[in-house]
């Protein structure tokens, strides 16, 4: 489907991308409903990614509000295209989930015993499971070791046997998911609804990250293999169906896609004059391909880059002013103070007084968010 009416330009898409994502701050539940998915990351620099994302979109938001209020909200933690938080209705689209590997009999028996243990207690911290079963240590993804119980709980959560009931000090506390099947039973799906569910998941990803270059749309559909592995074989068909129903334009040789109901050239998509520090996982800057197309410079997330090789900083926050990401900031909270350093893609800060006033206002908002003011 091609967009009709006024020809769409890259400037239209850039303004549309910012304005549609930075909606008027609302309640926590409504903000997550509007976003559809909030990516999580455990690094605090100066707060977790999910908190840094929500502070721009939730009125009066403070660091840690999501973790504190999660048990009372209709939300789930799970893997979608990345790991994060979803409204329960979206979460249910991915379940029952068929894992990519079949458990051995021994593993299934371990899972059954753990499931019964958690069901009896209601909600369980991983250390309680480890103390009761003493599963030992296993190698983790980073080359070190972790408790085998923790790894088993992670897998049981992924398979839909458990849900995250709450967090304690950042650690997931698990409960039995209401619709959990037996751990050694193969998950089944309603084949008649598989295509519609897959389409809904693709639309959810598009809604979160639009407008999308074709390469990013392809990437997101590939990443759905993590959230819905049972429908991996349908990904190519789902991508083809998406390209048929989404609006589309080719600009400077790049194919772009966005929800068909939206008109990026509309005057309603008008970013404000504010200055904002964004998390690297914010939907405005998450797509590094789109970032370079929109703003003409390369942002890199360097938390896992050796310090001598970093160019921007450990956890550089993209710096948005109006409809441009003009640089980055490294922000830390230490000894009750906010400490900041900035870099600019153009080599120096804008001279306009409006920028400096806006930056001071953003830093004050950050202090309040972190409880420093």
Task: List PLM regions with ranges.
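Long, charged, low-complexity, helical-prone intrinsically disordered regions
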Residues: 1-373
């Amino acid at each position: 489907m091609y967009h009709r009416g006024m020809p769409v330009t890259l400037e239209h898409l850039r303004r549309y991308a910012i304005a549609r994502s930075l909606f008027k701050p609302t309640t926590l539940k409504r903000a997550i409903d509007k976003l559809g998915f909030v990516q999580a990351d455990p690094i605090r620099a100066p707060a977790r990614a999910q908190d840094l994302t929500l502070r721009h979109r939730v009125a009066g938001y403070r660091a840690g509000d999501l973790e504190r209020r999660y048990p009372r909200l209709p939300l789930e933690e799970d893997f979608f295209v990345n790991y994060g938080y979803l409204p329960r209705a979206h979460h249910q689209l991915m379940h029952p989930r068929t894992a990519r590997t079949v458990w051995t009999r021994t593993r299934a028996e371990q899972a059954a015993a753990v499931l019964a243990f958690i069901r009896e207690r209601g909600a369980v911290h991983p250390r309680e499971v480890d103390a009761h079963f003493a599963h030992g240590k296993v190698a983790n993804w980073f080359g070190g070791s972790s408790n085998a119980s923790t790894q088993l709980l992670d897998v049981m959560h992924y398979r839909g046997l458990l849900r995250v009931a709450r967090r304690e000090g950042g650690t997931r506390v698990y409960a039995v998911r209401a619709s959990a099947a037996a751990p050694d039973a193969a998950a089944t799906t309603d084949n008649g609804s598989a295509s519609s569910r897959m389409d809904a998941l693709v639309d959810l990803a598009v809604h979160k990250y639009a407008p999308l270059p074709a390469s990013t749309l392809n990437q997101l559909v590939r990443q759905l293999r993590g959230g819905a592995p049972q429908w991996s074989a349908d990904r190519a068909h789902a991508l083809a169906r998406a390209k048929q129903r989404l609006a589309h334009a080719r600009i400077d040789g790049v194919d772009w896609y966005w929800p068909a109901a939206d008109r990026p050239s509309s005057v309603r998509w008008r970013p404000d004059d504010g200055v904002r520090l964004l998390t690297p996982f914010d939907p405005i800057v998450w797509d590094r391909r789109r970032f370079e197309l929109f703003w003409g410079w390369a942002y890199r997330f360097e938390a896992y880059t050796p310090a001598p090789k970093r160019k921007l900083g450990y956890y550089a926050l993209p710096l948005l002013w109006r409809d441009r990401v003009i640089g980055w900031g490294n922000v830390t909270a230490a000894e009750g103070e906010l400490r900041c350093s900035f870099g600019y893609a153009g080599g120096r800060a804008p001279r306009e007084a409006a920028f400096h006033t806006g930056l001071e206002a953003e830093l004050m908002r950050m202090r309040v968010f972190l409880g420093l003011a």
